[in-house]
């Protein structure tokens, strides 16, 4: 850069700092790059698919899927993992369907969980914004976007047309809270439902509720589906679940993870550790027997997983080894370089 341009830039930067304060414009090279902090989802495979070991803090995340696919279970699992790290969590229950007993079975400390059951969509989003701006809450779940009913619709007659009201509400709210979320380093997860577009002949007829704003503002979007049943004999005890990362601004997208959700217990984490351990050669499988470091740990996956539950120190060592190996291949994006990519994408 020639001297005239340097002087002009220095004058512009000086004027900006006087008007907007120090740090309004920064040179990226002046600060050390830091990896984006993440909160585990409770699923080892999904943490690895996300590329940074979990869901990114200071960002908006959308989780959507059909009914009974595991959306709320996954978010409660995120809360349980965050609380283990001492985080403060809040659940904005717009659907009025949160079951404290079920949340407790998944490992959530229900006594410390902040819960709100708002009357209108405006109230729900205002509460979310105030919690974010407090800088004291680390994780906020909004369940769900479809239940964020505008005040005008609640006060109107049944059958009245309210075209675009919810989409406008979401667009305005997200414009307002996105910057606050980044400053507070808070993870905000919106659960969303699926609807069908009428008259779509080709392509995917599925869409999510609440307009397009959330699709743009979300740094991560997860599509969760139930792919089958987990049975013990004839009894169904859980569901096979597949999660696809359909958007990811912090790591390469379109990866997917498969795991089991057991009813009343949550994500079958030890089963995932066994599967990934076999895949990486850390756990040896010979016929139906599983061995770890030369010692047999069980006949059949269920018994091997039970061994890890009974010996948590071995399970945690194995999990850490799997994380270190697979996340090193993923190559997490550094925070400041990623911000530039965001700006270019938007």
From Swiss-Prot:
It comes from the Bacteria. Can catalyze the hydrolysis of ATP in the presence of single-stranded DNA, the ATP-dependent uptake of single-stranded DNA by duplex DNA, and the ATP-dependent hybridization of homologous single-stranded DNAs. It interacts with LexA causing its activation and leading to its autocatalytic cleavage. GO terms for biological process: DNA recombination; DNA repair; SOS response. Belongs to the RecA family. The keyword NAD does not apply. This is Protein RecA. SMART domains: AAA. It is found in: Cytoplasm. GO terms for cellular component: cytoplasm. ATP binds at residues 65-72. GO terms for molecular function: ATP binding; ATP hydrolysis activity; ATP-dependent DNA damage sensor activity; damaged DNA binding; single-stranded DNA binding. CDD domains: RecA. The keyword Transmembrane helix does not apply. It comes from Pseudomonas aeruginosa (strain ATCC 15692 / DSM 22644 / CIP 104116 / JCM 14847 / LMG 12228 / 1C / PRS 101 / PAO1). Keywords: ATP-binding, Cytoplasm, DNA damage, DNA recombination, DNA repair, DNA-binding, Nucleotide-binding, SOS response. The lineage of its organism: Bacteria, Pseudomonadati, Pseudomonadota, Gammaproteobacteria, Pseudomonadales.
């Amino acid at each position: 850069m020639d001297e005239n341009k340097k002087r002009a830039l220095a004058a512009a930067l000086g004027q900006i700092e006087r008007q907007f304060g120090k740090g309004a414009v920064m040179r990226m090279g002046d600060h050390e790059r830091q990896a984006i902090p993440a909160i585990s989802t409770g699923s080892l495979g999904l943490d690895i698919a996300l590329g940074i070991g979990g869901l990114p803090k200071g960002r908006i995340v959308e989780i959507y899927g059909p009914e009974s696919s595991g959306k709320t279970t996954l978010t409660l699992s995120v809360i349980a993992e965050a609380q283990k790290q001492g985080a403060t969590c809040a659940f904005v229950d717009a659907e009025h369907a949160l079951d404290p007993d079920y949340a407790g079975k998944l490992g959530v400390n229900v006594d410390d969980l902040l819960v709100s059951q708002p009357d209108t969509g405006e109230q729900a989003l205002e509460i979310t914004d105030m919690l974010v701006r407090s800088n004291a809450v680390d994780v906020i779940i909004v369940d769900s976007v479809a239940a964020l009913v505008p005040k005008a619709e609640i006060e109107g007659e049944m059958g009245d047309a309210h075209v675009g009201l919810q989409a406008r509400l979401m667009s305005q709210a997200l414009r307002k809270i996105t910057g606050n979320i980044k400053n507070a380093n808070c993870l905000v997860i919106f659960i969303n439902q699926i609807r069908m577009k009428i008259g779509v002949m080709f392509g995917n007829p599925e869409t999510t509720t609440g307009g397009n704003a959330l699709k743009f503002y979300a740094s991560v979007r997860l599509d969760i589906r139930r792919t089958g049943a987990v049975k013990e004999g004839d009894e169904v005890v859980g569901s096979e679940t597949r999660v696809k990362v359909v958007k990811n601004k912090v790591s390469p997208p379109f990866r997917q993870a498969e795991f089991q959700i057991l009813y009343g217990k949550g994500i079958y984490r030890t089963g995932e550790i066994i599967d990934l351990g076999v895949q990486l050669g850390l756990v040896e499988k010979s016929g139906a027997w599983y061995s770890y470091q030369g010692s047999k740990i069980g006949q059949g996956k269920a018994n091997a997983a039970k061994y890890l539950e009974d010996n948590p120190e071995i399970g945690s060592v194995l999990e850490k080894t799997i994380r270190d190996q697979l996340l090193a291949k993923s190559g997490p994006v550094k925070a400041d370089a990623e911000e530039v990519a965001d700006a270019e994408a938007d």
